[in-house]
Amino acid sequence: MELRIPRRLLVLSVAIWIAASGFLWASHPSARITVRFYSAGLELPALYGSELDLPSAITKGVILDVYEHLENCRFQPFVQALANHQQELQLSDWHLYEVAARASEVMFQDSRYQIIFQWFILRKLGLDTQLFFNGPEVFLHAPAEDVKFGFYTLDLYGEQYINLTAKRNNLNMEDTKAYIPELLRDGKKVRSISMEMKKLPLLPDGRIVERLLEFTHLGQTHRLKVRLNDDYLKMMDDYPYFNQAQFFHLGLSPEAEASLVPALEEMLAGRNQLEKVEFLLSFVRTAFLYKDDRRRFGHEKPMSPEQTLYHSYSDCEDRSSLFFYLTQKLLHIPAIVLDFEEHVGVALELEGVKGNSFNFEGRKYIYCEPTGPSDELAIGEMWDYVRQQNARILTSYLPGE
C-alpha cells in the first residue's frame, strides 16, 4: 500500500512541539558550518533553528510530521552543497552519508532528530533510505545490493535493507526488534545506495606517513622509502567491506604513487620484461610478513595497495592487489586476477613463457604467484595446493582500457 505525504500546514502535534519549545525560525541564509571529513573541512549551509523537540516514542506520525516540517525549511542550499562536495571530491555514497551524518551532529542535539534529518536529506539527494523504529529509537536503513557482510540487515518486500545507523555507530543490534512501517513513497526518484568506491576521494593536504620497505631479489637487499597518505589509510580502515574486485582498481594516493613508482622504475631499468616481472614478484613476496586475515582480524578484510604498503603483515589477496597495480603502472601488459577457493593470485600475458596458464577472452595468461612464504616459485609455477583448486576471473586489465 502506498503511503502519501499530505500537502498541508504543520499538523497539530508539530504546532504543540513548536509552542512548547519556544521555537523561532532561525535558518539564516548566511549561517555556515564546517564538517570535518578526515583532514578536509567541508563547508555547508547551516539549518540552525530547524530542530523540533521529539516525543519520547517515535511513531509513523512523528516521522511524517518531521518530514513535512523539513519540507518547509530552506533545505535546498544544504542539499546542493552536499551534492557539489560529492562531485568535486569523488565521494562514494557511503562517504556522502558520513558527511550528512556529521553535519546533522553539528546542527542538532537529539540523535533521533539527526537520523530523521539524514533520512530526509539523503532522499533529497536521490538515495533510497527508510526509517525503522522500535519506540524510543529510530534507525536509518537502505537497500544495497553490493553489501556482502558487516551490516545488520532486514529482508523486506524482496529487498535487503542494511542498517546504516548501527554500522556507523558500532551498535549491537542482535536482540533489537524494529517496527517497520509502510515504506515512504514521496514521489522522489531514488536509487539504492552503492558501497562501490571507484576512486579514492580527492582530499587535499592529507598528513603524510613514511614507510621504509626492505626486500630481497636474487640474494641482494633493496630498500626504498614510500610516502603514504594517512587520510586514505584511515579511510580504508573505516570503510565497509564492498565488492572484492573493486579493491584491485583503487590504486594509490598521488603521494604514494609519486614515491613508489619512480623508485621501482629506477630499479627496473636495464632489465627485460621477464626480469622485471621477477623483480616485482620478489618485492611483493619479501617486503612484508604474511598473516591471514582471519588470524589478524577474525574475518576477511581486503586491503588497498596503500594499506598493504603501510602494514607489516598482509595476505595473498593484499599482495595480489599490489602486484596487479604495479604491473599496470610499470609493465603495461594485460593481467587477470584469479580468485581460487582458498587463494588469490595474478596471471600476466607473457609471450613465449611456459608454465601454468589460464585462457581468458582469447588471451593466454601465465600464472605469477605474488605470495610467499618464500621467493622460490618461478614465473608459471604454482603451489600444489593452489593448482588443485578451482578459480574464477575476479577482474582484469587491458592497456588502454
Model-derived regions, located:
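Bacterial N-terminal signal peptides that target proteins for export
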Residues: 2-11
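Bacterial N-terminal signal peptides
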Residues: 11-21
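A structural boundary/capping signal
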Residues: 24-401
